Amino acid sequence: SLIRYYSYDDILSVLNTILFEQIKVKTKKQVFISIGESGKSGDSMLYIVQQILRDKGLYANNIAEALKKRINGTEDLVLVDDFLGSGKTTSDWLKEEIINPEYGKELNDMIAEGKVSILSIVAMDRAIVLMSKNFPTIQVYGERGNKAFLHSGSVFGGSVTMIAYRELCYKYGAMLCPKAPLGFENSQCLIVFSHSTPNNTVPIIWSNKSIGNKRWTPLFPRFA
């Protein structure tokens, strides 16, 4: 399948590899916090991380709480979400957090010192580029992804086939999601998780809106 579907077991496997082989949680305790507003996909990810690490990590619901949980000031912060598509949402959220009058300076200092990282299941190349530009000291962990409709290296093969699929996705995507026919911020993703489908994925995969008087039946719903 050209759709990258991550089952719960796949997610556990990816996170285990990153946590123990890349972040190396056994050698140092970190404070894990979900990215963005409460109730978003980051919360689901944070819960899974808790199930994996148990008391090997510390966990917080927001930045203010996370900073208070740094017992001796040595713990790093790991910001958690399932997916980084364009990187804009995460970057904008961080920009707001670092100007918070209560804790912004402390967070900004930690970022400058390389004490903040991001954990995701998948991070698109363009998200990594944007984060590197706006926050060069933040390491982004996650499997790499790229746009589906590239002229070189597309998952659909050569340009002729790729263009045909792109036109198909755009035609129906424009009816289902006029502002983002190929996914949020033109992400052109084919990513699906067992718990949800990112809106960066092309809408023909997840939308259940109607075209005319016929409702579109998604292959995978936006939320499981």
Regions found by a protein language model. Name each.
Residues 1-224:
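PRPP-associated nucleotide enzymes
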